[in-house]
A protein has these predicted regions:
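A composition-driven surface/loop motif
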Residues: 1-142
Length: 142
């Protein structure tokens, strides 16, 4: 199963994914989710460090070698070409996908409460399904 780097490095992705660790599911899927979470933690750190090193490579620096930013916190560059090259390389990394060891999607019932943000972050690892009705209710419907 694949997830884009741009999703996994979003601030609340890991905490949202971690909520899946509290979901009742098969032992196999619990183990896979736990393994995925550990791998994602490591991967997020690598992607963030890589992004930071690209910024350090291209950004404008002061006399102390620190990255300069404007009053709004936006990083400054010596020229538009360096900024474009930096953004291009960062976007290339963010568009790459990580392959996570999850053999099947996590089932989320249609009546479970989630936010649109959580669904967007987890859309590659969840499947929204109808809750199965007990046999008695199925017979009544006929």
């Amino acid at each position: 199963m694949k997830i884009k780097n741009g999703i996994v490095i979003e601030d609340d992705f890991l905490s949202t994914f971690q909520e899946l660790l509290n979901k009742d599911t098969s032992a196999k899927q619990c183990l896979e989710l736990s393994t995925c979470f550990d791998e994602l933690l490591s991967h997020v750190n690598i992607v963030r460090r890589t992004k930071r090193s690209l910024i350090e490579k291209y950004a404008k620096k002061n006399n102390d070698g620190e990255i300069q930013s404007d009053e709004k916190g936006a990083i400054l560059f010596d020229d538009g070409e360096k900024k474009q090259k930096c953004l291009s390389e960062i976007n290339e990394i963010l568009n790459e996908s990580i392959d996570i060891p999850l053999s099947e999607t996590v089932k989320i019932y249609t009546d479970e409460i989630m936010t649109p943000r959580k669904v967007r972050l987890l859309k590659d690892v969840i499947e929204i399904v109808e809750r199965e009705q007990p046999e008695k209710e199925k017979v009544k419907e006929k």
